[in-house]
Structures are given as C-alpha cells and as structure tokens.
UniProtKB/Swiss-Prot annotation:
Keywords: Phosphoprotein, Transcription, Transcription regulation. GO terms for molecular function: transcription cis-regulatory region binding. This is Probable transcription factor At5g28040. Belongs to the GeBP family. Residues 22-32 have a biased composition (Gly residues). Residues 1-81 are annotated as: Disordered. The modification Phosphoserine is found at S14. Coiled coil: none annotated. GO terms for cellular component: cytoplasm; nucleus. It comes from Arabidopsis thaliana (Mouse-ear cress). The keyword Transcription regulation applies.
Amino acid sequence: MASDQRDTDFSAESPDLEEDGGGGGGGRGGGETESDEDVVIPEPNEAEDDDHDPDPDPEYEDLNSPSMISRAPATKSSSGTVTVALPAGSAVPVASIPSDSDQKWHRMTEIVHQRPPIDDSRRLFQRLWTDEDEIELLRGFLDYITNHRGNSSHPPDTAPFYEQIKSKLQLEFNKNQLVEKLRRLKKKYRNVMSKFSSGKEVFFKSPHDQATFDISRKIWNQTGKIIGFEDNNVMDLEETNHVNNANGSSGFNVSVIGNANVDVDSENGLEKKVTISRKRSRSRIGKIDEDKPVLAPCDGVIPNAVNLNENVAVGCDFGDGRNLGVLIEETVKNCVSPMIKEMMNSTTGMMMAATGGFPGGGAHALGVLSPMLMPSMNLGFGGKGVGDERWRRQQILELEVYSRRLELVQEQIRATVNELKTMPNGG
C-alpha cells in the first residue's frame, strides 16, 4: 500500500516536472536555475566601482581632483620604496602645473615691484631748485616785497607771492616747498652776516653765491617778519640791538657791520669777498616783528682794505622822526670826501715844496699831489715869482674854505654827542 501511494504521488507530480525540467537530468538543472534567480553576480569592473564610488559614470569625474588621486591603492614593494598607482588618464606632469598657482609667489612679486608714492615731506629734501631758479626766486621775491611792503601789524603774505612766482618758474612745486626754500636762503644769508659780525674773513666760492648774497641782503636787511616763512628762532643781525620804547615804536636802534681787512663795495658798503659756511646758525636770541633797515657805512669814497672794526657806521633812529644815521652819514661823507683828500694832498705838497725838495726822491711826493697843485709846483721850479705868488694865494683861500668846513663838521659832531647824552632812552 505504501509503495502504491508513493507511486501515485510521484506520478501526479511527474507531468509538472517533465514540463519544467524536460527529463530527470533536466529536473536537477531546473532546480539550480530556480534557486539562483535572486542572486546577481556583479561584473568585475562594476564591483570595484560600487566599492569606491557611488557614481558609476566616470564622465563627471575630474581627472585632476585630489579624490581621484587619493583613490589609487598604494603597495609597498620588497625593496622598501613606495609605488603609487594612478588611475588611467589622471596623471598630470609636474611641468604642466602653472607657476602662477602659488599664491605666496604672487605676494612676493607684488611687494618687489610695488613702489610707494613720494609724499610732500620727502620732496622737500630733494634737489628741485637749480641755481637759475634760486636767482629768479630771489629776484621775484624782492620785487614782490618792494611792491607789497607791509608794516609791523600787516606784513606781506607769501600766499599771493606763490601764485605770482609759480607761473614764472618752469618747475612744479607747492607752497610748502616755496616756504622751505625761502627759509633756507634766509638762514644762508644770516650765516654769512654772523661771520661778518664775528670779524672772520670769508670768501664766496662761486659767482652764484655772490649773486645770491647780494639779492638776499636787499631783501632781509630791510624786512622783518613776513607771513608764511617766519623764523623767530634765528634773528637777523640788524635785530640784535633792537629796543622798543613804551609807545611800541622803535627806539634807539644801532646796527653794526664789521670785518677786518676786506675789500669793500663802495655802492653798498659791504664786502665783495666772503665765504659761505656749510654750518647753519641756530642761535636763539629773540623775536622781532618790525621792519628794521640797516644803514651802510656811508655812500662816500671808501678806500680799499678798510678795517670796519675801527670805522663803524652807526644808524640811530629817534622817535620824533629825526634820523641820526643820516646826520652821521653826512658827517662821514664830508670827512672822506674828495675835497678833503685833495686838501690833505695839497698841504703835503706845499710843505715839501717849502723845504726845497722831496725826501726820498720826487716820485714819492708827486704821487700824493693833486692835479690842481702840479701847475704851481712846475712854476715854482721855473723860478717865476709872480706865478708862485698867485698860486700861493689861491691855496691859502682853499685852505681857509677847508678849515671852515672842518669847523662845521666838528660842530655837527659835538651836537650829535650832546644829543646822544641827553636822550632819555639812549641807554
């Protein structure tokens, strides 16, 4: 019974098995196929991509990206060296990497080639002014202060002068540079004047320095404080003896310029040969605001090699308008006038002629005789008594005139001395 039952079951299932497997051998093969339907065997390349990259499409992958390079497996060989395997097509030669990619190199290049702009403070110390520019600047400033002369309360301003001189000079400069240049030229002039006052013998080193000093003397011998380049730390030479009275006007103002054994210019009474010191005078004396002109020694004939330490020109200004300097100047002019020298020469010649000869030879005496005396001396040698008498009388008359003139000069000197002694603020 049992065997029949198994046969019945087998026969009932056999048609299905025959349809599916197609025989006994096919039935086993069909069983394997049915059990393997849910198993997917990946391809070798797909398995590798699934393990490392979720995106299987290599089209969107950057070949030079660090992720692609770090993705390559590294193996260590037996020799101790490390071999890095790169994916196909992702290796980039080192030479092809641009040098501009280094940001540090960019910064260094910019620092080397970048030049900071030059500010005004650095331009002040550069050589902007040539010798011709200095002369033109001083001449223009002299004309400006002559036309715009200010007093103690309203001195001339340098702002209009800057606008005026800017169009005349062929260079670019600002007002600060102009003020600095004028201040340096003023200090340069004061250094020369300080050497005069100390009695030192100095000489100009170039014609340009001579011309600069001449123009500067005309500017700063007559001006006090000027707006725009005041330098109150260093006073002018003519400002050292300034005295203010109670009313605020200038009192007894004396200016002395002296030097020993130097050549003197008869036009302005100052030395023509001086030297400019490289050191700058920085003496702190005081402060002055008013105009103080300096009187030259005199406008008369002055011999060369005059010792100005002994022959001093003194200018005195009284509060009531009288100018003592003019009086002294006229007195000195009378003392050293050509007529006085002619009188002295004539007197010397007459004394020598009266003795009957010329000591040491006639050439020495003839050198000091005036042309007016020569005809008389020739007549005296010729033995003509009438001519000698006429010349003698003429000389007596001339000497009397000179004597009276000397008396007038002495009276003026005495009156000046008495005036100085009786002045209330003369001390």
